[in-house]
Regions:
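Core alpha-helical transmembrane segments of integral membrane proteins
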Residues: 317-385
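An N-terminal hydrophobic leader/cap segment in hydrolases
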Residues: 2-44, 51-53
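Soluble extramembrane regions of membrane proteins in the secretory/endomembrane system
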Residues: 30-319
């Protein structure tokens, strides 16, 4: 091989190996190295088409249905923002659907259905629960209640809250609860409390507590959340440390007079509640081993009666971060491709003539009187006008 071509070709091969090797490694961590099948699914609803990434553990099916968790993202994000929860829950045996909300990611609402802030999120999670409840790999109890958890971040958290409320309203008519547990990340009741403007019931902590239906519920409220969990009477502003569990909203939610963070409480309806308060900001919930551990611990407690269908792995043992690192390495390899690839392409007959030698400097003629006249006009004209 021509020595002039050898080095670019070598670097091209190295870059390709990095891309392929680390992409394979990232895919391995995403699927727990073949123990979980990951596929994109689509399903129609009355409002449009929802899509998500389905994480189906090996062996899950009609003969071995599993506790299920539907996770979703915040405003202007997509299902991939829930990779950490989806990977860790699925490798412990849960079926997981990482959902794109309406008009986000691969999901789309029918024309005229959304179009406003209160259009895309209030029912997205509950519509996904309707679909998942009908699937043979999703566990139900002897009475037909779904063993399904709902978890979302920010707007996804608000959607999870409304899903629980709507499920309890439907229970009054059907006698079936499809949602068994719910954990919200980075959301309080700021927006669900305004659902009255959208013709729905406004949901605050008291309404949530009254409609919990004995479910296991939790909240993850970062101590430095930029948007939510303000103290009573406080308004938004610069980032400040917050103690949500001390607010009247949290007390109503936990149904306790002096609750503590990270503590389980039994409720009069037979349910359980907890509020986690990690030392984080709002978006850190997406990329946190601490937040992920809280999620795993929550569902371990929520689904403890169905532990036989799950795999016991300590919540501190997480692999999702290795997937992120592998993807970053693959991205570096992708960037490395460009220089050797361009160098080799320039050797092709079609592009060889595009290479030029050193250009001679341009000869500039001496400025004439016209140049000075135009310069003077350009300076004076703005002042005159």
């Amino acid at each position: 091989m021509d020595t002039k071509l050898r080095k670019p070709a070598l670097w091209l091969v190295i870059a390709l190996v990095i891309v392929l090797a680390f992409s394979w490694l990232a895919q391995g961590f995403n699927t727990s190295f073949g123990k979980v099948s990951v596929s994109r699914i689509y399903f129609d609803t009355e409002k449009g088409t929802l899509s998500g990434l389905l994480y189906l553990p090996k062996g899950a099916g009609e003969a071995s249905p599993r506790p299920t968790v539907v996770t979703t993202h915040g405003y202007l994000n997509s299902a991939e923002m829930q990779d950490l929860n989806a990977i860790e829950l699925s490798r412990r045996g849960h079926v997981v659907l990482a959902l794109d909300m309406y008009d986000h990611g691969h999901s789309a609402a029918n024309a005229g259905v959304t179009g406003s802030f209160f259009g895309f999120w209030p029912t997205a999670m509950y519509d996904a629960v309707q679909y998942m409840y009908e699937q043979p790999y999703v566990l139900k109890d002897a009475a037909g209640n779904g063993i399904i958890g709902v978890t979302g971040h920010s707007m996804g958290g608000f959607s999870s809250t409304t899903a629980i409320y709507l499920d309890e309203q439907d229970f009054a008519a059907s006698g079936i609860r499809k949602i068994y547990a719910g954990l919200t990340h980075g959301s309080d009741y700021q927006w669900t409390g305004m659902l009255g403007f959208a013709g729905m019931t406004a949901i605050d902590a008291t309404v949530m507590a009254e409609n919990a239906g004995g479910r296991t519920l939790g909240m993850l409220a970062a101590q430095f959340d930029e948007f939510f969990f303000n103290a009573d009477g406080a308004t938004g502003g610069t980032v400040r440390k917050k103690d949500y569990v001390a607010t009247s909203s949290a007390k109503a939610y936990l149904q306790q007079e002096a609750p503590q963070a990270n503590t389980w409480y039994d409720t009069p309806d037979g349910g359980k509640r907890i509020i986690y308060q990690p030392y984080q900001i709002h978006p850190w919930n997406h990329f946190s081993t601490k937040a992920t551990a809280h999620t795993l611990d929550f569902y371990k407690e929520a689904f403890k009666d169905y532990a036989g269908a799950l795999t016991e792995i300590d919540s501190g043992k997480q692999t999702w971060l290795f997937k992120e690192l592998a993807e970053f390495a693959a991205l570096i390899g992708f960037v490395m491709l460009f220089i050797p690839l361009v160098s080799l392409l320039q050797k092709l007959p079609f592009l060889r003539k595009s290479i030029t030698g050193t250009l001679a400097p341009r000869q500039h003629p001496k400025p004439g009187a016209l140049r000075y006249i135009l310069m003077a006009v350009g300076i004076l004209l703005p002042a005159i006008i």
